[in-house]
Swiss-Prot record:
InterPro entries linked to this entry: Acyl_CoA_acyltransferase (IPR016181), Glycoside_hydrolase_SF (IPR017853), Glycosyl_Hydrolase_84 (IPR051822), O-GlcNAcase_cat (IPR011496)
Stated consequence of mutating D175A: Nearly abolishes enzyme activity
Post-translational modification: Proteolytically cleaved by caspase-3 during apoptosis. The fragments interact with each other; cleavage does not decrease enzyme activity.
Protein name: Protein O-GlcNAcase
Annotated family: Belongs to the glycosyl hydrolase 84 family.
One GO CC term on file: nucleus
Regulation: Inhibited by N-acetylglucosamine and not N-acetylgalactosamine.
Record region (Disordered): 1-48, 441-465
Classification of source organism: Eukaryota, Metazoa, Chordata, Craniata, Vertebrata
Domain GH84 positions: 60-336
Summary of subunit composition and partner proteins: Monomer. Interacts with CLOCK. (Microbial infection) Interacts with human T-cell leukemia virus 1/HTLV-1 protein Tax; this interaction increases Tax interacting partner CREB1 O-GlcNAcylation.
Pfam family for this entry, one: NAGidase
Reported impact of V255 to G/T: Nearly abolishes enzyme activity
Length: 916
């Protein structure tokens, strides 16, 4: 019905236009000059439009644009967004997802009845939360501007959307080719004239809506030719575009580090109006390894009186945008009335706010903020403090989505993303009603559940936090100065107090959907049998393991998380500190080398002290990963897990590498020199650490997709110590027995002596072990140059083995164990020099079968190869029995390939190699 009604309306309008010669296709399509800002504009035919606010000032548009490339948000996420926007006093949502195919690629297609119902529901929800819903359409990929049928198709599409209740619109011509087709070139003098013509026509057709946005093709300073002030394109837009139409602008660049006041004044002059900023500071669709959890930054509050609005285009992952939107709201509210800085500073240059900003930035790696009204670091801390409450509230969407590391997940719940519906199918929000694995301290953010008296006594006493994290209603009626003063006073406190866990305040922070689901808890809770009810709670004995309880996410965890995933052009203070420390430890590692001449005890002590602090910082990352993985709110976890998994994995490698640097015998100068700016490379902080490792190009080892089911298990890779020998031998024996089924009960050390003993004794510098909570469960061993290693073996290791194992009688048929014993008494074959020139290093790796995480083996191989390449190796090889299919497959998955047989190769082994 919705479609039919909109089509009928369009037919009536087209009949009116056909009777009007001025509006016919034969009329000139060149747009007239835009009337003066105060001049009346003729009303269009669109009956669905809302009258403009004549004579009244338009409100400042501030909110979110869903304009990224990637899987669009689902409807329930958008409704949750509206709730948050209202709570934080923002007012606008621009619907423009690039991968909604009816928004961009197939813009001509009308919405189906089902899609129409969803859009109407969404528009209604926005109205309920007092959020202005702006529908954007991007016809620029293939529209013929001079074709009346194309223009009519666009009108028909927007007519349909207006029937849904939408009153605000946007035409986007971003990221398209500048060249016009031959038909358009005959009618329009330039690309800008064509765009302005159709924009003006649509604007008037819809009745000149109060909010109508236009995104130019030259939407940032770097896209303007030859520059902003001399751009013919922007000049045409400024002169011809009707004054009631606002222009979107991203700043000096597509992703602008800063948006100076001068740059806005420059573009405003040529487009003859104040722009609306489409801000990509938190957008991550251009780099699938990066996430941005830092504050809104680099935009002075002096911009507010010079703009018509700011819409942030944030991360693709919805739940990762809490900080981005919250800090934008803080920025906006800090100068909501558009007060100029010179007015603020007239009373006192040393105002309370500026003093607090100086205090907040003391000892910080960041530049001291000069904006007297807004401090990014203060805004970040406020956002993280409020966000912390969300982690303890059990919640997840019914269609769970876990994006893999690297490329975004292309299939969710078995449904390919190709030709996905333009409006996501209705997604029902469900709340997980199972008791989360939480420690007693987790109560600060947990689901309000009924506790027994005994449990209530165990809960720690908590105070409400006397900051802006209090009930939202208390701030609704306060003026800006009161709010600002309260923020400053609260931030002067030395420590943040625990958050209020009062059930009423928790309930107020929840979405209506969550509250509704909680009302129905009895309907969906799993059935409890009499047997379960009568069963006493298990209490472990004195010699048994205690019950596992997960620690809750802390504010320090979120601060560290934000620092690791900060902003496009900079890392957070802790992330930058870790990067600098690793660079210093790597560059100065020669001072702790055993063979270092002229040792300086002070330098050695400094290196070891800084290494210990760095390892401690790496440990904080592991702890943050564990607590986040165990958090009750799985919705947040699923959106961020792949990113946290990546940083955890790379920091595990880096920590192991630093430990190796501190205990090796040889110094090396194989490291890269010179530091680049953090934003010069892709991949964020994890990418920066990867590039500082010697094997930075081994992308297959660094590509470690997270498990389908999030896990908090953490493995440790560290250098081998002599005390670990028995554990390594045990793993070697168990895995060998598992492969051939021949236990060596009478000689338990035999297989270990054969496969790993020489490396453990003579090549200690290149040996690593894998540990979990139960002990050692894997090893990675190597030697940088096998030729001198074999010579050492002949001198010391082989004679010791010959003495330990008597040479068996070769006249009889030998057992597997006897064959290994005999090998110690036979001449060792030497590999060809032509082969060793390219693959000089010998490696041996194995992991216990209980380890099921495939990323662990990649991390171990990365650590081993990093140590070898750091000391000049060009390649590594390993020797495998032809019948050992398990280990052959194991090495193949780690990037090793079979070397073609050549003269001098042993006949009873397969040689696999890997270039470094």
């Amino acid at each position: 019905m919705v479609q039919k009604e909109s089509q009928a309306t369009l037919e009536e309008r087209e009949s009116e236009l056909s009777s009007n010669p001025a509006a016919s296709a034969g009329a000139s399509l060149e747009p007239p000059a835009a009337p003066a800002p105060g001049e009346d504009n003729p009303a269009g035919a669109g009956g669905a439009a809302v009258a403009g606010a004549a004579g009244g000032a338009r409100r400042f548009l501030c909110g979110v644009v869903e304009g990224f490339y990637g899987r669009p948000w689902v409807m329930e996420q958008r409704k949750e967004l509206f709730r948050r926007l209202q709570k934080w006093e923002l007012n606008t949502y621009l619907y423009a997802p690039k991968d909604d195919y009816k928004h961009r690629m197939f813009w001509r297609e009308m919405y189906s009845v089902e899609e129409a119902e969803q859009l109407m529901t969404l528009i209604s929800a926005a109205r309920e939360y007092e959020i202005e819903f702006i529908y954007a359409i991007s016809p620029g990929l293939d529209i013929t501007f001079s074709n009346p049928k194309e223009v009519s198709t666009l009108k028909r599409k927007l007519d349909q959307v207006s029937q849904f209740g939408c009153r605000s619109f946007a035409l986007l011509f971003d990221d398209i080719d500048h060249n016009m087709c031959a038909a358009d070139k005959e009618v329009f003098s330039s690309f800008a004239h064509a765009q302005v013509s159709i924009t003006n026509e649509i604007y008037q057709y819809l009745g000149e809506p109060e909010t109508f946005l236009f995104c130019p093709t030259e939407y940032c300073g770097t896209f303007c030719y030859p520059n902003v002030s001399q751009s013919p394109y922007l000049r045409t837009v400024g002169e011809k575009l009707l004054p009631g139409i606002e222009v979107l602008w991203t700043g000096p660049k597509v992703v602008s580090k800063e948006i100076p006041v001068e740059s806005i004044e420059e573009v405003s002059k040529i487009i003859k109006r104040a722009p609306v900023i489409w801000d990509n500071i938190h957008a991550n669709d251009y780099d699938q390894k990066r996430l941005f959890l830092g504050p809104y930054k680099g935009r002075s509050t002096e911009l507010i009186p010079r703009l018509k609005g700011v819409l942030t285009n944030p991360n693709c992952e919805f739940e990762a945008n809490y900080v981005a939107i919250h800090t934008l709201a803080t920025w906006y509210k800090s100068n909501m009335n558009g007060v100029r800085k010179d007015v603020v500073m007239t009373d006192s240059e040393d105002s309370t706010v500026s003093i607090q900003i100086k205090l907040e930035n003391e000892g910080s790696d960041e530049d001291i903020e000069t904006d007297v009204l807004y401090s990014p670091q203060m805004a970040l801390k406020l956002a993280l403090t409020e966000w912390l409450q969300e982690f303890g509230v059990p919640h997840q969407y019914s269609s769970r989505q876990v994006a893999h590391s690297g490329a975004k997940a292309s299939v969710v719940d078995g449904t390919p993303l190709v030709a996905a519906p333009s409006l996501n199918a209705t997604t029902v929000v469900t709340t997980v009603y199972q008791e989360p694995i939480m420690s007693q301290g987790a109560a600060l953010s947990g689901e309000p559940t009924t506790l027994t008296k005994e449990e209530e006594k165990k809960q720690p006493d908590e105070e409400p936090m006397d900051m802006v994290v209090e009930k939202q209603e208390e701030t609704d009626h306060k003026n800006d100065n009161q709010i600002l003063s309260e923020i400053v006073e609260a931030k002067m406190a030395e420590e943040l107090k625990p958050m209020d866990t009062d059930k009423e305040s928790i309930a107020e922070s929840k979405s209506p959907e969550m509250s509704m689901q909680e009302d129905c808890i009895s309907d969906i809770a799993p059935m409890q049998t009499d047997e379960q009810t009568n069963k006493e709670q298990f209490v472990p004995g004195p010699n048994e393991k205690p019950l596992y309880t997960a620690e809750p996410v802390t504010l320090e965890d979120l601060q560290l998380l934000a620092d690791l995933f900060y902003l496009p052009y900079e890392h957070g203070p802790k992330g930058a500190q870790m990067l600098r420390e690793f660079q210093w430890l790597r560059a100065n590692s020669s001072v702790v080398s055993v063979n270092c001449k002229g040792k300086d005890s002070e330098k050695i002590e400094e290196w070891r002290s800084r290494a210990a602090k760095f390892e401690e910082m790496c440990g904080l990352v592991m702890g943050m990963f564990t607590r986040l993985s165990n958090c009750a709110n799985r919705t947040i976890l699923y959106d961020m897990y792949s990113y946290v998994w990546d940083i955890k994995s790379i920091m595990s490698m880096v920590k192991s590498f630093v430990q190796w640097l501190g205990c090796r015998s040889h110094s090396s100068a194989q490291f890269l020199i010179g530091d680049q700016e953090p934003w010069a490379f892709r991949g964020g902080l994890a990418g920066e650490f990867q590039r500082l490792l010697p094997i930075d190009g081994a992308n297959d080892l660094f590509f470690q997709p997270p498990p389908l089911t999030p896990t908090s298990k953490v493995y440790t890779i560290r250098p081998y110590f002599p005390k670990d020998e028995a554990s390594v031998y045990k793993i070697c024996r168990e895995m060998y027995d598992d492969g051939v089924g021949l236990p060596f009960q009478s000689q338990p050390d035999l297989i270990g002596d054969k496969l790993v003993g020489g490396l453990l004794s003579l090549s200690l510098d290149y040996c690593f072990v894998l540990e979990d909570e139960d002990g050692i469960c894997g090893y990675a061993l190597g030697t940088v140059d096998v030729t001198p290693f074999i010579k050492k073996c002949k001198i010391s290791w082989i004679p010791f083995m010959q003495e330990k194992y008597t040479k068996p009688n070769g006249d009889k048929e030998l057992s597997e164990a006897e064959k290994i014993m005999l090998s110690f008494h036979e001449e060792q074959e030497v590999l060809p020099e032509t082969f060793l020139a390219n693959f000089p290093s010998l490696i041996k790796m194995d992991i216990h079968k209980k380890v099921t995480d495939p990323s662990v083996a990649k991390s171990m191989m990365a650590c081993l190869l990093s140590s070898l390449k750091a000391n000049g190796s060009r390649g590594a090889f390993c020797e495998v029995r032809p019948d050992d299919k398990r280990i052959l497959e194991f090495y193949s998955k780690l990037g090793c390939f079979e070397i073609a047989k050549m003269e001098g190769f042993p006949k009873d082994v397969v040689i696999l190699g890997r270039s470094l």
